[in-house]
Regions:
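Glycine/small-residue-rich loop that forms an oxyanion/phosphate-binding "nest" at active or ligand-binding sites
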Residues: 1-7
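Conserved acidic, metal-coordinating active-site core of Asp-based
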Residues: 8, 12, 16-19, 23-133, ...
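Mg2+-dependent phosphoryl-transfer enzymes with acidic/Ser/Thr/Gly-rich catalytic loops
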Residues: 103-180
Length: 180
C-alpha cells in the first residue's frame, strides 16, 4: 500500500477511537489490541512503522455503526487507496447485527478481478471456462473476469443482481451444493 495513504488513514481513524488494523506479512499490527493471540500493539510512531514495513491492507473497525459510517467519506478522499470490502450493514439497511462494523482498505489496483485475470493468463484458461462464487461487493471485480457468476442467497443485493445463478446461503453450504 502507498505509505503516505496509510499514514493519512491512521490520522483519520485513530482520533475517532476506532481500531486501526494493518496487515503486515503474516501478522496484524493494531492501535488497540483486541485479540492478543492474533495481533500486536503498534508500539512506535506510525510513520516509522509504515516506512519499515510492507502493509498490504488496513481495516478500520468498531462496534459503533455511526462511527464507521461517518469515517467512510473521509477515507474515500484518500488518494491511491479504496475501500475493498465493508460490513454488510453499511451497504444494505435491512442487514443488522451486533457484530463489529468494519471497512477493509487496500491499494486502488488490488482486487479479486485483477488476481483472477492474471491467474487466467498464467494458466492459459479462457474466461468462458471459469466460474466465480461470491457474496459481497469485493467479489464484483472478480465477476467481470469469469464466464459464469454465482451468488450465495445471503449475498448483498448488488452482487445478486450481477449473477447468473443464486445458490443456497453460506450457512446452508451453498457453495458445496452448487459444486455438486
Amino acid at each position: 500500500m502507498n505509505k503516505e495513504a496509510i499514514i493519512k488513514l491512521y490520522e483519520i481513524a485513530n482520533p475517532e477511537g476506532v481500531r486501526f488494523i494493518m496487515n503486515v506479512g503474516e501478522g496484524r499490527v493494531v492501535n488497540k489490541v483486541k485479540h492478543p493471540d492474533q495481533e500486536k500493539q503498534l508500539e512506535e510512531d506510525i510513520r516509522e512503522f509504515v516506512y519499515k514495513n510492507d502493509v498490504v491492507q488496513c481495516t478500520i473497525a468498531d462496534s459503533n455503526f455511526d462511527k464507521i459510517k461517518n469515517l467512510i467519506p473521509k477515507i474515500e478522499k484518500v488518494e491511491n487507496v479504496e475501500i475493498k470490502n465493508r460490513h454488510k450493514s453499511l451497504l444494505d439497511t435491512k442487514f443488522k447485527d451486533d457484530k463489529t462494523i468494519f471497512c477493509d482498505i487496500a491499494n486502488i489496483d488490488s482486487n479479486k478481478g485483477n488476481a483472477v485475470k492474471k491467474l487466467l493468463e498464467i494458466l492459459k484458461i479462457k474466461k468462458e471456462e471459469t466460474i466465480a462464487i461470491g457474496d459481497d461487493v469485493n467479489d464484483l471485480s472478480m465477476f467481470e473476469q469469469v464466464g459464469y457468476k454465482v451468488a450465495v442467497s445471503n449475498a448483498v443485493d448488488i452482487v445478486k443482481e450481477k449473477t447468473d445463478e443464486i445458490t443456497l446461503s453460506n450457512d446452508e453450504d451453498g457453495v458445496a451444493v452448487f459444486l455438486n
